[in-house]
Amino acid sequence: NQFIKCEFNNISDFTNKLNKYKNDLAAVIIEPIQATSGFNFVDKKFLSHIKQTISKSNTLFIFDEVWTGFGKTGHNFAYEYFKVTPDIVILGKSIGGGLPLGVVAMKNKIKNSFPGAQSSTFQGNILSIQSSYFFLKELRNINYLKKIKKLEDFFNFHRRNLIEYKFVNDFRG
């Protein structure tokens, strides 16, 4: 009945809290790139440690890809970039094609563990669903990952020139 926060990229803090709450831990949720707090990337060693540690239990591994999904990392999803496979992926923003829509995608073994049909109060907003349909259809029609790669190369080339300015402290990504 509680949410335990761990210091981002701190293996020791994660391990201590995991040991303290391991009998009551249902899931580990991670936002792989914390955009709001300044584009902080999860460390691959930290992510690997989490995945390896919780795979020994029934703890679910959840990726919050609301911000990172659909090509924003140069991959369809950030978990592909980090080479891990979560049990559940949370999606939003882009998938609605500009309209509010959230999606919880999960492995079949989890989906099949819910008896009967599931629903929510605002399920099935037809306008958001149609917008999502056209957004996903458009992604199939264009080679969007190739376009993203070209933009990435362009910005990486030109950011070298920007680093010379004193007001530029850091580049991430």
Write out the residue ranges for each language-model feature:
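Conserved N-terminal phosphate-binding loop of PLP-dependent enzymes in the Aspartate aminotransferase
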Residues: 1-173
